[in-house]
Amino acid sequence: MILFFGMFSAQKNADLIITNAKIYTVNQSFDTAESMAVLNGKIIGVGKTADILKNFKSKNIQNLEGKTVFPGLIDAHCHFTGFATDKWKCQLWGTKSWDEIIARISDYAKTAPKEWIYGRGWDQNDWAIKEFPNKEKLDQLFPNRPVYLKRIDGHAAVANQKALDIAGITKDSKILGGEIELKDGKLTGMLVDNAMTLVEKYIPDIEDKMAIQYFSELQKECFSYGLTSLHDCGITEKTLGLLEKAQAQNSLQMKIFALMEDNPAYYDRWIKKGRYTNKNITVGGFKVYSDGALGSRGACLNHDYSDKKGWRGFLLSDRKHFENLAKRLKNSDLQMATHAIGDSANRTILQIYDEVLCGKNDRRWRIEHAQIIDKNDFDLFGKYSIIPSVQPTHATSDMYWAEDRLGKDRLKYAYAYEDLLKQNGWLPLGTDFPVEEISPLKTFYSAVARKDSKHFPANGFQKENALTREQAIRGMTIWAAKAAFQEKEIGSLEPGKSADFIIVDQDLMTVSEDQILDTKVLETFSNGKKVF
């Protein structure tokens, strides 16, 4: 195989030539090549080393001595800006008990310069006592300072009495699409989904210059994992402005496909404006939340939770809200990307999409997560051309307790990635970081092995829904690009596309399954320039 922009009688200049590599082009045929030439950030030739050196010349020739090259990896669902601006908060990821959290925030409170004590990352499912915390200890330690600690999934939080008072929350407060937890008629401090907004609007934003600094720092981490593009789900106009400012200052090189948050104040402006691109930043649609998360029992189910009788979760807005937005977006070139975890939420959004789009189409409207699907609803994705955008590490993070929530029968139809892939023949993959870790290698491993990082369980979790290695790589490259209408620019190593690629120390397509997570990204290139 050799692919050029035409055949040349004389050597053409290139900024960079890669030779003696094993290059997975991830083109339609999944061809491999040995060599690649790059000019002005674009790929101008791919083929055998001898042919590339015959047709191109460069002062920068990199002999990879057999190392493996993949297209730059794309995260099809994450919260880049949200995670970056969480950096000033108390980090609660990996905590194993409520006591450990109390210790962390007590230390943080001594050094934090802001009045609010704001933390994120706890998960009660990792504790010996798998129950939501309450505010009692927080009230004792911080009676005059507001405390707000968000769960790992971003769909629940515990607040102390000071924070509740600032927000005006009492035992009689109610909100659509959220839960203000009471026990014995008293506030516990637990807030789920929309109830969280009552407090969050009072928490001050970080300074713009700090946000831009954190974008740059998080970008470096993403590049180190081989990510060259990502889909940032649910950002504000202010955040978009900060991204563009960071890009203008040359502190942001990451390709970002942004989905705006579901804010009615944005509708007219963005529907009129349509799809928007500023260099590496593209706004392509709206991110909408239909329900909450399974871990905090906010996912909207068709039947009761197996571990909470009489409770089915809830939709975060009434059906009319989703219908009206879908109808408005139909007349634009913007995508609708709706978070749906529970089988009831997924069915609701599938039905609304069908009512608006009327069957087969190429609008590429998405359902983010598509986590629990009623067995009778899978074919609706294919019937209506709806794209499930999934995060394989959710399966291996939730597998320890998901059966408690769903029972054996429903669990069979959860995290069913192979079944979902069959519907349209392609499936974009992401991480949902910071809910999960940034590493796309863990996405790959979870998708193909259905195991956690300790290689548990031995036979894989519901292995019948594992993806092949080729499917997983496509999901992290060309299919992720396709989910954003960017497959002509990025996602594979072909002439005319951006020279976004990574060099790794072992071949993910052939290395033994238990060695996948040992793979190291050696170098990352974006637009032909080395960024890691």
Model-based region annotation:
Residues M1-N13:
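Bacterial Sec-dependent N-terminal signal peptides
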Residues N13-T19, Y24, Q28-R269, G284, ...:
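Divalent metal-binding segments
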Residues I23, I43, K67, Q124, ...:
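Short, glycine-/Ser/Thr-/acidic-enriched flexible segments
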Residues H77, S385, D500:
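Active-site-proximal glycine-rich helix-loop-beta segment
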Residues N144, N278, K308, L380-S397:
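Extended low-complexity acidic/polar segments
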Residues Q247-N250, K273-I281, C358-K360, F381-S385:
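Acidic (Asp/Glu)-rich catalytic clusters
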Residues G274-Y276, V511-I516:
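Short proline/glycine-enriched turn/loop segments at secondary-structure junctions
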Residues K327-A337, S344-W365, H369-A370, K375-D379, ...:
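His/Asp/Glu-enriched, well-ordered alpha-helical/loop segment
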